[in-house]
Amino acid sequence: MSKPVALITGASRGLGAELAKSLSSTYHIIAVARTIGALEELDDQIKKRGGSSTLAPIDLINTNAVAQLCRSIFDRWGKVRLWAHTAIHAAPLGPVITMDSKDWEKSITNNVTVLAKLIPMVSPLLQEDSKAIFFEDTTIMKKFSSVYGATKAAQIQIVKTWQDECKSTGPKIYIAQPNPMPTAVRARFYPGENRKELQSIEKEAKKLVSLLKL
């Protein structure tokens, strides 16, 4: 397979899916998500564009499954040119004094612990000229966002630290902040928002590919 490999964790919908489609003209896509049906739909759309993908329907919480995936990637392709992590758990908005412990624990697991385990497992697949991209979301860092905001901030701090550590050696680590888009996460937070006023997910994905020269 002549195309370089792009690993998209959280590829079943939203920005992850649109990035996968936008990148499929120049990359072989490894699409990771829990939802098999959504991954199969993504695969169909990529094929219609003349691209190719490998589907990995796994839960990122499952460390053994992720380790097996990384080993399989190494055995087949040897390296990953691009890693985009878009997977996120969005706990409901609410006052700090009513924080639910289950929402907190699930958010810590999915948004912080998963990333803390992913980076050590994926990084051996990344070379000096590889790229990894993560996504900031300060548009929701306001009141009532304590659980989501805290875990998202922790996630980004991990990435910033890794970014500093890789400045002289590679890979290149990017932290991007797309404009507000009509994603399922945003709809959960702002159900009454006029989604027509938000930026197209497809356009934001294409803009990221262009700006970051992915």
Q: What positions do the PLM features span?
A:
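Amphipathic alpha-helical dimer-interface segment in Rossmann-like NAD(P)H-dependent oxidoreductases
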Residues: 22, 71, 75, 110-130, ...
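Catalytic loop of short-chain dehydrogenase/reductase
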Residues: 88-89, 116, 124, 129-168, ...
